């Protein structure tokens, strides 16, 4: 079956923003204007098509990134048909993992900002993730109809806080109640949308006289930005020669795709203004799969390999999300990077080393699914029937194996014990938790060996609350949850040289003999664990060295202070000895473990606690109370600024997670319910001696 839309006319984009910037409404309008969706879904009444899980509709926040396909021929029907695959991403910090994994499979992003709130904490997180995966982006300043809306202030914030080179390609006509439309700086004409047709009809008009000077100023800045795309354009621009519309667009596109500029637009999705022009900008400035570098990976024998976005290349795809669907079971969302695959084909998963048959292939429009027979390079679809695949796995042609770069997932920072309300539900709860953990790699399930309790871990209180809620709704398991526990870590500050570990058992017959000498030292923060083999002259035989490493790795799971996982250490095997008959892998595993434990005790072990970046938005009269309260929680207040558009202060602080449980309740009573806060994991830091002592003693008693 030939391809309907050439790959050059594909756009795989994400729409991401801070909570409440109007991202879901923006996506809904896209679906409406692209003719897919004939009734506008409003988040206010819980009917938005993209928000398809029950809790999302209740909370009014988007939790799961639904992937949707839409077609667009331009606001004025002036383009050949383009296919836009949209991944809707959540804006709440507890769901950062969702944003992270959608960024991994996107080619471009549209960042939505609230014209009043501007750049908020989650906006910064999303921006960092987009930088990590080098995702080109455009910015859409939404809610221009709100009181306090200020397009140019948001531009300054993008420059100051995000270090983004934002280039307006539109400026607003009016603001707040008087927001009428935009000035298109490329055409130098105003666009006014017609309210009666819900913004489907529009007209170009002359720029209002009071805006002519401002429009000219920003037009010149935009043309200069476009001219910097090439020597030739720059020379013509500097010699005073005008650039055509086409040349301006080409220059802006080149620089956007290279990540050098961020074109800026504005509108009000709720009032049906500006989204149509934003779709045109997606086509004009964001890359198609062929405009971004080929995807890199490696073959099974670890040679570097790449796949180009072409139907003629071998099939390769990345599974980026797993969902459980009540009707068809497990859905695996995947992005095809190269080649073609048909339903019924066998694909290979090199991460799991398994071949699997691809069952049905579904293309999702929010939660409405269309079954299709094949997918090609650039497509995003969902597969039914893959049992082994998990998030981040590669799917590829069994004869042309490639392993694409895996995604990195954050470690959970909070844990809770969970048990079913009735004993009969124990098994059902196990199945439910495993299913949820498969869907969400930042959610972990484990059994506490001492107490036998089931422990769930995640990125924040809201994250775990929603998962427990889903367990009840989707699997019918009611569970009670224990008090949240902090995920402490242990590390060392000092070095320990020549630490000996001997495991000897010789009582007649075959004995055990393992003897190693280690140097143990700290690694930089985030450095993880490193094992170095520095054995000379075969004093420890080659075949036993991996066993020493294994013994140390096992010991890393329970540190010497309070049994928490050990991070950021380096162990160097420097010496040892063996016995011809009695030495074996197990003996060296035990010796490695004993030596490392002793080394850790001698190398100044310390307890680390997770520190959270906290931002509180509060009316001015409560600022003192809020800051005092954060300080009493061992918080360090880093700064304070006015909330954009007036109305209070933003207090920024770094606070230990251990002191932040139940903070939302305290904040409500401190500020008569008028303040809001966001919190996300920042880094691990050494816990003060008195805190460490209390944690260690509690573990001993427990």
From Swiss-Prot:
Main location: cytoplasm
Domain tr-type G positions: 8-290
Protein name: Elongation factor G 2
Compartments in which it is found: Cytoplasm
Recorded name of the encoding gene: fusA2
Function, in words: Catalyzes the GTP-dependent ribosomal translocation step during translation elongation. During this step, the ribosome changes from the pre-translocational (PRE) to the post-translocational (POST) state as the newly formed A-site-bound peptidyl-tRNA and P-site-bound deacylated tRNA move to the P and E sites, respectively. Catalyzes the coordinated movement of the two tRNA molecules, the mRNA and conformational changes in the ribosome.
PROSITE patterns (alphabetical): G_TR_1 (PS00301), G_TR_2 (PS51722)
SMART domains registered for this protein in UniProt: EFG_C, EFG_IV
Classification via SUPFAM superfamilies: EF-G C-terminal domain-like, P-loop containing nucleoside triphosphate hydrolases, Ribosomal protein S5 domain 2-like, Translation proteins
Binding site for GTP: 17-24, 88-92, 142-145
Keywords: Cytoplasm, Elongation factor, GTP-binding, Nucleotide-binding, Plasmid, Protein biosynthesis
Species of origin: Cupriavidus metallidurans (strain ATCC 43123 / DSM 2839 / NBRC 102507 / CH34) (Ralstonia metallidurans)
A GO molecular function held by the record: guanosine tetraphosphate binding
Family: Belongs to the TRAFAC class translation factor GTPase superfamily. Classic translation factor GTPase family. EF-G/EF-2 subfamily.
UniProt keyword Disulfide bond, yes or no: no
Matching InterPro entries: EFG_II, EFG_III, EFG_III/V, EFG_IV, EFG_V, EFG_V-like, EFTu-like_2, G_TR_CS
One GO CC annotation: cytoplasm
Cleaved signal peptide residues: none
Gene Ontology BP annotations: ribosome disassembly
């Amino acid at each position: 079956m030939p391809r309907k839309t050439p790959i050059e006319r594909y756009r795989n984009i994400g729409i991401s923003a801070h909570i409440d910037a109007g991202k879901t409404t923006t996506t809904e309008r896209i679906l409406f204007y692209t003719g897919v969706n004939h009734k506008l879904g409003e988040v206010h009444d819980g009917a938005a098509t993209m928000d398809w899980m029950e809790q999302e509709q209740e909370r009014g926040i988007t939790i799961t990134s639904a992937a949707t396909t839409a077609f667009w021929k331009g606001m004025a029907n002036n383009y050949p048909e383009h296919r836009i695959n949209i991944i809707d991403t959540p804006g709440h910090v507890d769901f950062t993992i969702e944003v992270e994994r959608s960024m991994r499979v996107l080619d471009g992003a549209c960042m939505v900002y609230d014209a009043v709130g501007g750049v908020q904490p989650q906006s910064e997180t999303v921006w960092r993730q987009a930088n990590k995966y080098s995702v080109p982006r455009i910015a859409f300043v939404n809610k221009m109809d709100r009181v306090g809306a200020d397009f140019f202030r948001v531009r300054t914030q993008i420059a100051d806080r995000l270090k983004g080179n934002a280039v307006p390609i539109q400026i607003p006509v009016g603001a707040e109640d008087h927001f009428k439309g935009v000035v298109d700086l490329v055409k130098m004409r105003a666009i006014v949308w017609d309210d009666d047709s819900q913004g489907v009809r529009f007209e170009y008009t002359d720029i209002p006289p009071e805006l002519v000077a401002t429009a000219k100023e920003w037009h010149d800045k935009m043309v200069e930005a476009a001219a910097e795309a090439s020597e030739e354009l720059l020379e013509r621009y500097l010699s005073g020669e005008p650039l055509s519309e086409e040349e301006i667009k080409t220059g802006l596109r080149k620089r956007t795709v290279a990540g050098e500029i961020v074109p800026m637009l504005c509108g009000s999705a709720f009032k049906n203004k500006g989204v149509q022009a934003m779709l045109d900008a997606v086509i004009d400035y964001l890359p198609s799969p062929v405009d971004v570098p080929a995807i890199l990976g490696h073959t099974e024998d670890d040679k570097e390999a790449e796949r180009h976005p072409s139907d003629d290349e071998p099939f390769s795809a990345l599974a980026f999300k797993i969902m459980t669907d009540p009707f068809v079971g497990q859905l695996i969302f995947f992005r095809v990077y190269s080649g073609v695959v048909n339903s019924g084909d066998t694909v290979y998963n090199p991460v799991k080393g398994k071949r699997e048959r691809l069952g049905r292939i579904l293309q999702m429009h929010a939660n409405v699914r269309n079954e299709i027979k094949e997918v090609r390079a650039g497509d995003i679809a969902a597969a039914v029937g893959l049992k082994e695949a998990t998030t981040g796995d590669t799917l590829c042609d069994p004869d042309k194996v490639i392993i694409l770069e895996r995604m990195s997932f954050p470690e959970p920072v909070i844990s809770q014990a969970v048990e079913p309300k009735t004993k009969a539900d124990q098994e059902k709860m196990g199945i439910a938790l495993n299913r949820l953990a498969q869907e969400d790699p930042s959610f972990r399930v484990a059994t506490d060996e001492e107490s036998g309790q089931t422990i769930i871990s995640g990125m924040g209180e809201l994250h775990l609350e929603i998962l427990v809620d889903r367990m009840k709704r989707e699997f019918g398991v009611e569970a009670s949850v224990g008090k949240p526990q902090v995920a402490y870590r242990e590390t060392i500050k000092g070095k320990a040289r020549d630490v000996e570990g001997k495991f000897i058992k010789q009582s007649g017959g075959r004995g055990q003999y393992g003897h190693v000498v280690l140097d143990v030292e700290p690694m930089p923060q985030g450095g993880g664990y490193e094992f170095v083999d520095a054995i000379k002259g075969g004093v420890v035989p080659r075949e036993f060295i991996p066993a020493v490493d294994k013994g140390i790795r096992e010991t890393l799971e329970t540190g010497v202070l309070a049994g928490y996982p050990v991070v950021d250490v380096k162990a160097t095997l420097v010496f040892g000895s063996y016995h011809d008959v009695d030495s074996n892998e197990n003996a060296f595993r035990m010796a490695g473990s004993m030596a490392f434990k002793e080394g850790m005790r001698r190398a100044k072990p310390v307890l680390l606690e997770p520190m959270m970046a906290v931002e509180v938005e509060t009316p001015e009269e409560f600022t003192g109370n809020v800051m005092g309260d954060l300080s009493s929680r061992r918080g360090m207040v880093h700064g304070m600024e006015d909330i954009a558009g007036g109305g209070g202060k933003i207090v920024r602080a770094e606070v230990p997670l251990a002191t932040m449980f139940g903070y939302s309740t305290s904040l409500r009573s401190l500020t008569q319910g008028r303040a809001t806060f966001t919190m996300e994991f920042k880094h691990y830091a050494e816990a003060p001696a008195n805190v460490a002592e209390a944690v260690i003693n509690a573990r001993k008693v427990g």
